[in-house]
Amino acid sequence: MRRSLAASALCMILAAPPASAQLVLPGSAAPDPAAGAEKAATPRKTPKAAAAYAPPGVEAVVGRPLSLNGANGALQLSGGADALKIDRLTLLGEVISDPTRQCRIDVGGGTPIEAKSAGRPDGLLRFAVDIPACPFEFDVLDGAVLAPPQLKACIFEQADCQASPSGLWGAAGSALGAAEAKQIEQARAHAEAALAANYHALTVRLNDPAKANDLARDQSRFSSDRQDICRDYARESAHGFCTVRLTEARAAFLKARFDELAPAAEKNPPPARRKRKPPQQ
């Protein structure tokens, strides 16, 4: 049941409509949808840009041992953005014939698996993995990858095992100590600031009371959805690794939606004027 709730929450965070969620910053009250509608109805200047957010490249995860929820399975990547490969993918699941028992499957059997670039649909680098029994996608975060929920578990009939790669793959929770927790706390402050700024800029650009209401409602749900997902991350309360990574993912998502709504003038700036050459003497 907990896995099902977490999957639903992850789906909300990753696949929300353009009117998306915002993190409620510490010390601030949850946004009032009615107030959001009033502000959206008031004519305001369109912001020139949302807060700057530089999504990480594949170097942030290549060569690092990653575990699902910081405790289960194993994922290791190699190569670059144009030739990314999965060197190791181990999934922990349940025995099909006896769901009360756990099973472990080594996907690929040690043979590197190609991960093809799928662009940046939600602001982060996305890669697609075409495994016959278990196709999935993942987004690249800082020291982690985030795989969205699947419609159904991957079935490995010969191994009598079913498993899912969905969730946050990151550093082992047991390896994150006090020093790492302090760095994570600083990263969270930056991520929350970017998220708040991107939400505000998107609200202004929407310029529609109904959409502003939807965005405000999604905002108020984000914090609880994130908590549901990160509850299963190993030692999350001691370091907050999952919390900051999902906050960064949401900030990137809002930035992508903001950019999609850019006025035509911003998307297609006029060509630069050529300087006239002085007449030759």
Regions found by a protein language model. Give the residues of each.
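Domain-scale selection of a single, long terminal region
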Residues: 1-2, 22
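Sec-dependent N-terminal signal peptides
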Residues: 4-13
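Intrinsically disordered, low-complexity segments enriched in polar/charged small residues
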Residues: 7-8, 19, 255
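N-terminal signal peptide c-region/cleavage motif recognized by signal peptidases
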Residues: 14-18
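N-terminal alpha-helical modules
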Residues: 22-281
